From Swiss-Prot:
Coiled-coil intervals: none
Localization terms from the record: Secreted
Protein name: Adipokinetic prohormone type 1
GO cellular component terms, semicolon-separated: extracellular region
Signal peptide, first to last residue: 1-22
Family, per entry: Belongs to the AKH/HRTH/RPCH family.
Organism: Schistocerca gregaria
InterPro entries: Adipokinetic_hormone_CS (IPR002047), AKH/RPCH_hormone (IPR010475)
Main location as per UniProt: secreted
Amino acid sequence: MVQRCLVVALLVVVVAAALCSAQLNFTPNWGTGKRDAADFGDPYSFLYRLIQAEARKMSGCSN
């Protein structure tokens, strides 16, 4: 019984370690990165206009 509990506890520790493994690299020279936040504004505005147009179409059909 004790041996079974130890095996289960060891298995839980191994699975937890496998799920939590990660690598962290830090460098002071990261800079601004590869992406610019301004690039994401255009698709969102397009989707907003598309949703507005579809809502107008649907409100016209309800009459």
